[in-house]
């Protein structure tokens, strides 16, 4: 059994026991969160109906926070001497899926 869940505007394929990195959430390590299911596949049946998915719960335990790779951004304007260099590291929260019920 697995589910497609939405978190932070992105979709992740999860099953029970999977560790997934989602966009940063404000919950502390050790707390439990609920993820929004978009699709649930249970062996032979596929469920994507909103009424049925309203009863399905995907729970996960927050393990901690991590950072993604450093991304370097360079803006350059020709003939004016304008250059701007900037860096960015996306923050993620690691969660472990504890259950898909419903």
UniProtKB/Swiss-Prot annotation:
Keyword annotations from UniProtKB, A to Z: Ribonucleoprotein, Ribosomal protein, RNA-binding, rRNA-binding
Physiological role: This protein binds to 23S rRNA in the presence of protein L20.
One GO term describing the cellular component: ribosome
Protein known as: Large ribosomal subunit protein bL21
SUPFAM superfamilies referenced in this protein's UniProt entry, alphabetically: L21p-like
Subunit structure: Part of the 50S ribosomal subunit. Contacts protein L20.
Highest taxon above the source species: Bacteria
Record-level Gene Ontology MF annotations: rRNA binding; structural constituent of ribosome
Organism: Cutibacterium acnes (strain DSM 16379 / KPA171202)
A Pfam family per the record: Ribosomal_L21p
Gene Ontology process terms (BP): translation
UniProt family annotation: Belongs to the bacterial ribosomal protein bL21 family.
InterPro entries recorded: bL21-like, bL21-like_sf, Ribosomal_bL21, Ribosomal_bL21_CS
Upper lineage: Bacteria, Bacillati, Actinomycetota, Actinomycetes, Propionibacteriales
